[in-house]
A protein has these predicted regions:
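N-terminal, membrane-interfacial amphipathic/helix-forming hydrophobic leader that caps
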Residues: 1-92, 231-300
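Residue-level signature of the transmembrane alpha-helical core
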Residues: 100, 108, 112, 142, ...
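Cytoplasmic juxtamembrane interface segments
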Residues: 2-9, 84-85, 193-226
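Interfacial aromatic-anchored transmembrane helix boundaries in multi-pass membrane proteins
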Residues: 183-197, 230-243
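Transmembrane alpha-helix boundary signature
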Residues: 86-93, 115-130
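Aromatic-anchored segments of alpha-helical transmembrane domains
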Residues: 29-36, 115-121, 178-187, 225-233
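Residues that define the loop-to-transmembrane-helix transition and helix capping
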Residues: 171-172, 216-217, 269
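Function-critical hydrophobic alpha-helical transmembrane segments in multi-pass membrane proteins
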Residues: 130-191, 201-204, 208
Length: 300
């Protein structure tokens, strides 16, 4: 079961819902700020140690930026652990390392399988074209995938979803987290209300995994593998961003096919195939969590 907290800043009493929301805002700012601070500091340190001059026209090598992103992710996780341990006066089972490897592998498999299913439907239907290409940019793809998996899921799942649950209950938390995730992507290149709807439909995947395991690791693995498979392996645009492409394949919309079928410039995740796969996966995982009794939280 998910532990949502019942002591410290979220202890029972007057204005508990408001205290939970204020704590949510503080954790979001602190976590993202720590990630950025440490990532930039480590990037500067490794480039300085390597004797490399970094400018806006000549950024740090991709491997150095990968190391910096991993350091930032570790700092973000540590910041969350410390804040919850002392601010909410409880242990932090959502970051239990004893199950981290198995959970990560589970999530990686689910993310890769779901994205492969989406692209397979598109390709077999003639909605996209897939061609071979020269392999490169793996370090950059790993950096972007790990960063999005850790930062987005820790903030959205462990902070926003969990504390909305604490404040208002599980159903408002599910709706609020899903709508926020979709809305945030409306600012991405080539986004649309339909693209946001597809992402909202897929939010049940991450929420379901979190409810079932009570931990964040499988959700991080799922998100990272989804992006890496979509962007690097298939060479597709990821949420309107093309930086990850560089793997063995290059995917593009077939000529004359509507964006709603191909995903257009936003990528395969903004397509009818993605909507269908995401709804099925979200429904299956949430139903399984409900059957396991995971819609009831642990306070301590």
């Amino acid at each position: 079961m998910v532990m949502i907290g019942s002591a410290g800043v979220v202890a029972p009493g007057k204005w508990r819902w408001l205290r939970a929301l204020a704590w949510l805002a503080i954790l979001c700012v602190a976590a993202v700020a720590m990630f950025n601070l440490v990532a930039k500091a480590v990037s500067w340190l490794v480039t300085w140690a390597g004797g490399i001059a970094v400018t806006s026209a000549s950024p740090a090598p991709p491997v150095f930026r990968l190391v910096a992103a991993i350091a930032g992710c570790i700092a973000l996780i540590a910041t969350y652990w410390a804040a919850v341990r002392f601010g909410e006066k409880r242990r932090v089972p959502e970051l239990d390392l004893r199950h981290a490897l198995s959970d990560l592998l589970l999530g990686l498999g689910i993310g890769a399988a779901l994205l492969t299913a989406i692209v397979s439907v598109q390709w077999m239907s003639g909605w996209v074209v897939i061609e071979p290409r020269t392999v490169d940019r793996v370090a950059q793809a790993l950096r972007d995938s790990i960063r999005s998996g850790v930062v987005e899921e820790l903030v959205l799942r462990l902070v926003i979803f969990r504390l909305l649950w604490r404040a208002f209950g599980i159903w408002p938390a599910i709706a609020g987290a899903a709508l926020l995730f979709g809305a945030l992507h409306l600012a991405n290149p080539d986004s649309s209300p339909f693209a946001a709807a597809c992402l909202i439909a897929g939010e049940g995947i991450g929420i379901g995994l979190y409810l079932i395991t009570g931990r964040i690791w499988s959700v991080i693995g799922m998100h990272a593998a989804w992006n890496f498979t979509q962007g690097w392996i298939f060479g597709a645009t990821v949420s309107g961003i093309t930086d990850i492409a560089g793997g063995p394949l290059a995917l593009r919309p077939a000529h004359g096919i509507p964006d709603v079928l191909s995903g257009g410039g936003f990528g395969p995740e903004a397509s009818l195939a993605a909507l269908a796969v995401s709804l099925l996966a979200s429904g299956a995982l949430l139903f399984h969590a409900l059957r396991l009794g995971r819609f009831v939280a642990r306070d301590r």
